[in-house]
Curated annotation (Swiss-Prot):
Enzyme class label: hydrolase
SUPFAM superfamilies the record matches: Ribonuclease H-like
Record-given protein name: Crossover junction endodeoxyribonuclease RuvC
Keywords: Cytoplasm, DNA damage, DNA recombination, DNA repair, DNA-binding, Endonuclease, Hydrolase, Magnesium, Metal-binding, Nuclease
Pfam family, one: RuvC
Positions bound to Mg(2+) 1: 7, 141
CDD domains linked: RuvC (cd16962)
GO biological process: DNA recombination; DNA repair
Cited NCBIfam families: ruvC (TIGR00228)
Positions annotated to bind Mg(2+) 2: 69
PROSITE patterns named among the record's database cross-references: RUVC (PS01321)
Free-text comment on the cofactor: Binds 2 Mg(2+) ion per subunit.
Name of the coding gene: ruvC
Gene3D superfamilies, per the entry: Ribonuclease H-like superfamily/Ribonuclease H
Length: 182
């Protein structure tokens, strides 16, 4: 299974692709989609660059699902709104490519990757490098995106284990043994 992680941002959006092979994670690709070269006031054009960039990543790496960071509330409400629009452009690109999208907070990602929800960017970069056996530190935005893909891989494993452990087994439940058959 191939998972695409997206760390949305209006100026720089990170992406990271991870291949899940049983309990093993393999690095596929990572990078950034930048709008820093564009005129600041041209929001629609920047959102289009993000949308097109995410669609291009999806077409190139063919992920099975995606994981996106949930927007945090910022001190500056205008910045939060702009980030929300960037996130919306990224999610729209993913769902228009028929991908299932999971969402995680930065705290959830940091806890899954570094073991501590308030880990710094450098700690996330170090752990992503170690978990994926990378030769060098990934960039901050790419590391966050890879961290989101790793988080979803771990969450998927946990969900499968829980489902298997709690699945009803025919003729094995206490109510069946007590003579209650439905």
């Amino acid at each position: 299974m191939r998972i695409l992680g997206i760390d949305p941002g209006l100026q720089i959006a990170g992406f990271g692709v991870v291949e899940v092979d049983g309990p093993h994670l393999h690095y596929v690709a990572s990078g950034t989609i930048k709008t820093t070269h564009m005129v600041r006031g041209d929001l629609p054009a920047r959102l289009k660059v993000l949308f097109d960039g995410v669609r291009e990543v999806v077409q190139r790496y063919q992920p099975d699902m995606a994981s996106v960071e949930i927007v945090f509330t910022n001190v500056n409400p205008q910045a939060t709104l702009l980030l929300g629009q960037a996130r919306g452009a990224c999610i729209t690109a993913l769902v228009s490519s028929d991908l299932t999208v999971a969402e995680y907070t930065a705290l959830q990602m940091k806890k899954a990757v570094a073991g501590y929800g308030k880990a710094g960017k450098a700690e996330v970069q170090q752990m992503v490098m170690r978990l994926l056996k990378l030769p060098a530190l990934p960039g901050k935005d790419a590391a966050d995106a890879l961290g989101l893909a790793i988080t979803h891989a771990h969450a998927g494993r946990s969900t499968a284990i829980l489902a298997a452990a709690t699945a009803l087994k025919p003729n094995a439940s206490a109510s069946y043994k007590a003579g209650r058959h439905y």
